[in-house]
Amino acid sequence: MYKNAKVIFITPDNNLEKLRETAFRDKKTVVMTNYGITRGFFLIRPESIPEGKEEVASLLDGVSRYWKHQTLEQLKESVGHIDMLVTGASAITPSGIRFGKGHGYFDLEWAMLYTMGIVDGTSVIVGAGHDCQVADVDVTVEEYDTAIDY
């Protein structure tokens, strides 16, 4: 999945800093938002990050030096399709339902990207966490809940 992905959406979770750094080193194009989606979507192309600055760029304060704000229309034109999406989670059921993080921002991000045709059923969704965060509990699933694939 990751190896073949050219464009990856990575949520601004602190636990995903190393993933962002690795993606920049691996020359992946990264799409992200800020916390709360208050400033919309941002595109970070690998060539915009000077060699050796990948770690700084992976931090929320650092990435703002290299990202380019994108409307959804611009994002569709710039990247076309997002191959992989990665989000953090407080907990995940074995069936891929995230819970405990609150606010539903990832569900909203997915819905906006899906409506624009930037993500679809072939876009892989990964929940990043530790094995101890997988909880076999009954969770009420809402129609707008976006399940993870892995």
Model-based region annotation:
Residues 18, 33-35:
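N-terminal functional module of multi-domain proteins
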Residues 12-16, 132-133:
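Short beta->alpha connector loops
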Residues 1-6, 26-29, 37-150:
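Surface-exposed, charge/polar-rich loops and edge strands
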Residues 18-23, 140:
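A short acidic, amphipathic alpha-helical/loop segment
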Residues 10, 32-33:
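General beta-strand structural signal in soluble alpha/beta enzymes
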Residues 11-12, 101:
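Small/polar loops that bind or transfer phosphate-bearing groups
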Residues 16-17, 106:
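Alpha-helix N-cap/helix-start and coil->helix boundary motif
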Residues 1-10, 17-19:
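N-terminal targeting/leader regions
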